[in-house]
Amino acid sequence: MDLLPTKGFPQVAAAEGEDAAAIDVGDQYILFAADGIMESLVQTDPYYAGYFAVLVNVNDIAAMGGRPLAMVDVMSIVHGNVCKEIIRGMQDGIRKFGVPIVGGHVHPDCHYNAIDISIVGKVAKDALLRSSTAAPGDDIVFVIDTDGFYPDHLRYAFVTTVQKSDDIVRDQMEAVAIVGEKHLAHACKDMSNPGGIGTLGMMLECSEVGAIVDVTRIPAPKDVDPIRWHLSYQGCGFCFACPPENSQEIIDIFSKVSCEGAVVGKVDDSRKLKLTDGKDTEVLFDFAKDIITGCKPKEE
């Protein structure tokens, strides 16, 4: 069932299954995305809830090859001290990424605390990166900032941006735009809540393809348990599907902005995500029967 149909709206160039919608406004696309923060994070650490609300939205625009313009927020507040911490986190995120919050809405005296942000960005039409266009034969390239830490109370949130300079953090986002402008990748997705492998699964599902990934090739800090790492939200991480001849150039672009990169696998037409360690191989997702998001790409 198509609950929110976009057919019949010719201005919609990309929607369901993408990190941001792409809206045709003439010589470029306006990118439009939104993210809500899990209630558990708001309860555990409202500061990081506010900061991550900014970060995840900026990442969504970057993943499309775009550059962010501005955000609006919606806050629901029951405790004033929680509100202050959320705002403090958002303020630090605004300063870090250089993207303003220009308005929004507050629900005061609510029965719960919540923060949601929506963002707009822009991208040239020929530089748009989708997550639904990975193709059999593509290399799978992971680029990840492995210089970070886990806050004591956030087991699966790997923080890489708060301790870095504003310039390097913004350059990391700009690196994705460079990949788009140089037409180096067929598809891109920012590593989000399901971790790097889970994010790849979302890309493959939406692209209606499969892949095999060697987990031993995935960039990782030396002192982190591998299972924890693969389940972690990455402060800065992107998954690309690209022609093999472009893989090294993508890795080189990100090496200049404190990110490790590697070819970790290959896209195929199996519609299965298979993991190997060089000895054993197992199927993680079989998209003939497994569903991650259920999203399908927009038909052109």
Regions found by a protein language model. Name each.
Residues 1-42, 64, 73, 84, ...:
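Extreme N-terminal cap/leader segments of soluble proteins
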Residues 26-32, 37-39, 67-154, 247, ...:
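Glycine-rich anion-binding loops of enzyme active sites
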Residues 45-72, 85-96, 171-180, 196-202:
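Small-aliphatic-rich amphipathic alpha-helix that forms the alpha element of a beta-alpha
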Residues 152-168:
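Short, compositionally biased
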Residues 166-235:
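Active-site-proximal betaalpha loop/short-helix elements
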Residues 241-248:
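Helix N-cap motif at beta-to-alpha junctions
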Residues 249-259:
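Short amphipathic alpha-helices in soluble, non-transmembrane regions
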Residues 257-300:
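Acidic, Ser/Thr/Pro-rich beta/coil linker or hinge segments at domain junctions
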